[in-house]
A protein has these predicted regions:
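N-terminal/edge-of-domain interface segments
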Residues: 1-147
Length: 147
């Protein structure tokens, strides 16, 4: 995501995104090993959320640290995430957070999760809680401590 000065390397070929959902053909929770040290974790995500699922906790991003603690971001439409197509409007309607253009009237969300200092990141989890919701993890970057 060049505009935000946060590097995400997304492979052109092969699997480059993972989605969670309550639908039978998706996992409702995934955990991705990270095992890197940094001061923040930047996560690029996108969601498809039915309007009937707004104003409730749709999912959660969790950064697990090597000391057993974690940092959570609750994904709640429209407070911290919204539908990637803006529910047909083509415009983000999220109330907070940082929408990022994915091109052609689509958008995702950039989350910068502060770790409270230089910490070892064990993994990142994504979990979906509501029906008629798909949440995708498009990229993870650990931001190193400034030198």
């Amino acid at each position: 995501v060049v505009d935000e000065r946060i590097p995400f390397t997304i492979p052109v070929e092969g699997d480059n995104a993972v989605f969670t959902s309550m639908y039978d053909n998706f996992p409702d929770r995934i955990e991705i090993p990270v095992n890197e040290r940094g001061r923040k974790v930047a996560v690029l995500a996108a969601a498809s959320i039915s309007l009937m699922q707004s104003r409730m906790d749709n999912g959660r991003l969790r950064v697990n640290l090597s000391d057993g603690t974690h940092r959570d971001v609750v994904l709640r439409d429209p407070e911290t995430i919204d539908d990637w197509l803006g529910s047909g409007t083509g415009k983000p309607y999220v109330l907070a957070g940082h929408p990022v253009s994915l091109g052609k009237n689509a958008h995702g969300h950039l989350y910068e999760i502060d770790l409270g200092g230089d910490r070892m990141v064990k993994s990142v989890e994504l979990e979906t809680f509501t029906n008629e919701t798909m949440i995708g993890l498009l990229g993870i970057t650990v931001l190193q401590a400034e030198k």
